[in-house]
Amino acid sequence: MKIYLVGGAIRDRLLNIPVRDRDWVVVGIRDPKEMLKKNYQQVGKGFPVFIHPKTHEEYSLARTEKKNGVGHTGFLFDFSSRITLKEDLKRRDLTINAIAQDSSGKIIDFFNGKKDIQKKILRHVSYSFQEDPLRVLRIARFAALLSHLGFYIAKKTLSLMKLICSRKELLYLTPERIWKETQKGLSTQNPHVYFQVLYSCNALFFLFPEINYFYKKTYFLNSFIKHINLVQYSLIELSKISKVTKDINIRFSYFLQFFYYVYPIPNIGTKDYFFYKKPAFLLKKMLIRLKIPKETSEIIFFLCGFHNFLQNINIQSSKLIIKFFNIIDVWRKPNRLNQLIYLDFYNFNSLKNKKNDFFLGKLLKYMFSLIKDISVCSFIKEKKFKGIEIKNDLNRLRIQSFKEMKEKIILNIF
């Protein structure tokens, strides 16, 4: 039995970037029970993966794969003792991830991964690459992860990604798996690259059809900005916001705000000016389909629906501002305001004079600070109301207090 360090740990070390986790492959083991005898814990259904009792790192048995179905899970695995290290590495996605190291520290590189690291190329190991649709998302993620180092996708690899998409195998990926890879893509230094790659290989059409639909469309906004591509501009904005915050909820919701501009409000006097349902509910359908976590979904939903209201928060009535605070439940979740402050970056209608100083967000936080202490508990001590009476009277008190403080707000901000 031999054990080798494989994959990302070696790649990252060769790139001189921090090693996040280490994975191992076990070659030549006759009976998987030998691992259990050494106190490893077995996980995984399709093939045995063992967790080290002390380091908690993953040890996988060397294996080969044979396509026998569709999607990411349609494979038969052979993890018998005759499987060699080279056979195991050959099934991996990229050459830069198919490098191994033995116990003496010797690097084993059957597929020229080191050479591709030097050339900064993301290249598939073999043509079996095309059998797993998840690899389309993985390569998009690696492109985003390593783009700041100058890495790019090899032409033949991109062609195989397009081939996978043309076979419609992406449709067999579970929403959970799509979101997991997207989450990782959003966590990189350049998350906009993730979506650009998905579009370039036609994967966006299957994974995010709502975004893909608007990718090439241009829109008339005003006399100063006659035509703009909303999605591509939003990707530029996503790149900018990613330099300011690592919060993926902010990054993703910030990017998706372009949906608001797809459907211009027909009449400024309508209630849509407060919360614009049409783009918000289009987004909501996508969020539900992809089973995106509730907290992330709510932030995206609020930012899109309340986009215009928040862009004009300085002229809103006290009643509407308190109503907004109630809807987003800021009394129990004040951190949501810390996510909303980034809205000041994103305003198509002021592209020429954008200072990006978070003025609107600061104003919003200041407004909340003036009335946040008017809580249910403090109110109950002074009033003897019950049930809905408490809610209604508390709301009236907040609105009245806010009206009285409006002049103070203007003086402090300006």
UniProtKB/Swiss-Prot annotation:
A GO term (biological process) for this protein? RNA repair
Residues bound to CTP: 8, 11, 92, 138, 141
State where Mg(2+) binds: 21, 23
Stored Gene3D superfamilies: Beta Polymerase, domain 2, cca-adding enzyme, domain 2
Its EC top class is transferase
| Keyword Signal attributed | no
Binding-site residues, ATP: 8, 11, 92, 138, 141
Highest taxon of source: Bacteria
Q: What is its EC number?
A: 2.7.7.72
Quote the catalytic activity from the record: a tRNA precursor + 2 CTP + ATP = a tRNA with a 3' CCA end + 3 diphosphate; a tRNA with a 3' CCA end + 2 CTP + ATP = a tRNA with a 3' CCACCA end + 3 diphosphate
Matching entries from HAMAP family are given as: CCA_bact_type2
Additional free-text comment from the UniProt record: A single active site specifically recognizes both ATP and CTP and is responsible for their addition.
Q: What does this protein do?
A: Catalyzes the addition and repair of the essential 3'-terminal CCA sequence in tRNAs without using a nucleic acid template. Adds these three nucleotides in the order of C, C, and A to the tRNA nucleotide-73, using CTP and ATP as substrates and producing inorganic pyrophosphate. tRNA 3'-terminal CCA addition is required both for tRNA processing and repair. Also involved in tRNA surveillance by mediating tandem CCA addition to generate a CCACCA at the 3' terminus of unstable tRNAs. While stable tRNAs receive only 3'-terminal CCA, unstable tRNAs are marked with CCACCA and rapidly degraded.
What is the recorded name of this protein? CCA-adding enzyme
To which species is this protein native?
Buchnera aphidicola subsp. Cinara cedri (strain Cc)
Gene transcribed to yield this protein: cca
